[in-house]
Amino acid sequence: MPVIQWSEALHLGDAATDANHAAFCTLLNAVADASEADFVSALDAFIAHTEVHFAEENAWMEAADFPPLHCHRNEHDNVLALCREVRRRAADGDMALGRRLVTELPEWFAQHVDVMDRMMTTWLAQRGPDAREEAAA
């Protein structure tokens, strides 16, 4: 059963960001659906995607001189640190904590997309395509 649905509410109209967000939803749902035996490996795949996703956003924000970069990056860092700690504890047998993370992340993600990422994509659109090209270079 999905814990989060990719929907218009999460759609920002920015192709790269929307693709990352759709993958985030798909992978988080895979963690939610994973058996206990497969939970940690599904969480590993989710964390690996999220590391790349957040690093990409961080690079875009830095290249575009996004004013609240540090606040946005700190939120990314905190969520990744939490996911890594929960992964460690789930690998040690604390599946209840792992399952709790999966049920609580969707609310955080929806708020993050609506506030933080919406501001970021608006800023990037105003700065033009060069901001992302600089980040990719």
From Swiss-Prot:
The keyword Iron belongs to this UniProt entry's keyword annotation: yes
Stated role: Oxygen-binding protein. May be involved in a storage mechanism or for delivery to oxygen-requiring enzymes. The oxygen-binding site contains two iron atoms.
Subunit structure: Monomer.
Highest taxon listed in the record's lineage: Bacteria
Gene3D superfamilies in the record: Hemerythrin-like
Residues reported to bind Fe cation 1: 21, 53, 57, 117
Name of the protein: Bacteriohemerythrin
The keyword Transport is annotated on this UniProt entry: yes
Residues the entry annotates as binding Fe cation 2: 57, 72, 76, 112, 117
Family according to the record: Belongs to the hemerythrin family.
GO MF term set: iron ion binding; oxygen carrier activity
Keywords of this entry: Iron, Metal-binding, Oxygen transport, Transport
